[in-house]
């Protein structure tokens, strides 16, 4: 009866809260106001190294055409560059594998600052979320241990029109 339902509801709520517990955001130490050598707000249309792969009106998504996708020197599955009204505002990186995940975490910490390693701060469970928050840029990484797949968003925080079209959902 009631006790069984209350216990089940409590178990569901507990699991939902702990399945994807994010780590606390840490300050982004070196905010480059962009991604690699491309400042936020830049037009990608004139840049030869990019090809448009999707066009959804005010949103356009590009990929680099003359090189394999890599974050630093780490090979990844894909890197996509999103513009909103022709202004560069987001990079989405997808990758697979626990070894790649560890290499990417090391790379991001060397570039943007160390994560808070206080016990309880780093996530446990099937979904791990890490966030670096700067003045111009936010870097958010989500890794699912069950599928060994990760996604990273590098996003402009200062682009006047926030990219709120739903493409920043962390789904694979």
Regions found by a protein language model. Give the residues of each.
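Bacterial N-terminal signal peptides that target proteins for export
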Residues: 1-10
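Residues marking helix boundaries in flexible regions
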Residues: 13-14, 94
